[in-house]
Swiss-Prot record:
Microtubule inner protein (MIP) part of the dynein-decorated doublet microtubules (DMTs) in cilia axoneme, which is required for motile cilia beating. It is found in: Cytoplasm, Cytoskeleton, Cilium axoneme; Cytoplasm, Cytoskeleton, Flagellum axoneme; Nucleus; Cell projection, Cilium. GO terms for cellular component: axonemal A tubule inner sheath; axoneme; cilium; nucleus; sperm flagellum. Residues 98-109 are annotated as: Mn 1. GO terms for biological process: flagellated sperm motility. Its main location: cytoplasm. This is Cilia- and flagella-associated protein 68. InterPro entries: CFAP68, CFAP68/107.
Length: 169
């Protein structure tokens, strides 16, 4: 096959693809969104609005932890999973116990009453999992706007020169 024959063949192939695209409304491409096996079909301008994730008028996964793909960390440390009690030890469990487990994994089970639901700012917010030194749940903008102004209150989280621990030279 010569170069001119190959050029004619490629033009013919391109015309066939274009003709197939113009005559078949379902001809399009499958776009892989990322490595989590999501497939977006891009057949025409309106097809994307019928796919999962594009519909905005339904209540699909309203702010659940499965909205983000591959969000295993948030699923693992969700309050629903933490509050569930651990299974009771088996009578044969000592056969499978390793020296590492006996040395390092001897923590007592945590009580579930400490995970009492606290006020949260948005549906996925879990302020009860934040350690106390970092917990700074102040008033929201809505609460600040519609409450009596407090001039003597200073937040610990906002830098205040009177609370500064560094001495000037």
């Amino acid at each position: 096959m010569t170069a001119t024959d190959y050029h004619c063949y490629s033009e013919f192939f391109q015309r066939q693809v274009l003709a197939c695209f113009l005559t078949n409304p379902h001809y399009g491409s499958l776009i892989n969104a990322d490595g989590h096996a999501e497939v977006w079909t891009d057949w025409n301008d309106m097809s994307k609005f019928f796919q999962y994730g594009w519909r905005c008028n339904t209540n699909e996964d309203a702010y659940s932890n499965r909205t983000l793909m591959g969000n295993w960390n948030q699923e693992r440390y969700d309050l629903k999973n933490i509050v569930q009690p651990k299974p009771l030890p088996s009578q044969f469990g000592h056969y499978f116990e390793t020296t590492y487990d006996t040395s390092y994994n001897n923590r007592r089970p945590l009580s579930t009453h400490r995970f009492k639901r606290e006020p949260h700012w948005f549906p996925g917010h879990q302020p009860e999992l934040v350690p106390p030194p970092y917990k700074c749940t102040e008033k929201s903008t809505y609460m600040t706007s519609y409450s009596k102004p407090q001039t003597d209150h200073h937040s610990v989280c906002v830098w205040n020169p009177s609370n500064c621990q560094f001495q000037s030279p």
